[in-house]
Amino acid sequence: MSDHSDISTDCNSATELFSAFAENDESDVVVYAHCGGRYADIELAHDGRFEKSMEIHSSWGTFEWLIQDAFRLGYRVGIVANSDGHKGRPGASYPGAALFGAVGGLTCFLVNELARESILDCSHIH
């Protein structure tokens, strides 16, 4: 990368990211704990002010232990399931199912109107 003009804003860990959000009064953010197949210790970096939900299922698999750890630690979080294919095809199962043995997930938000603001507001409510 040739442009380093904003390098001072880079965050190299979730803890740094949450600190930056707090320092800059950034509360209108969407952050989900996400598992890429390996165990992730959410006790090391969880901030309930910003991380309102945890991704428990994706085309990478189902990671129930993530929400079990959250509940054991007393975290109050929502549950989301995503495709995680980075292709803009919500709920699509190909190629994830062939590679990882799981079909991508979908998340439901109960809102009064189908609008970005309503969905974001809903995502911040447990």
What feature does the model see in each segment?
Residues M1-H126:
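Extended, charged catalytic domains and RNA/DNA-binding interfaces, predominantly
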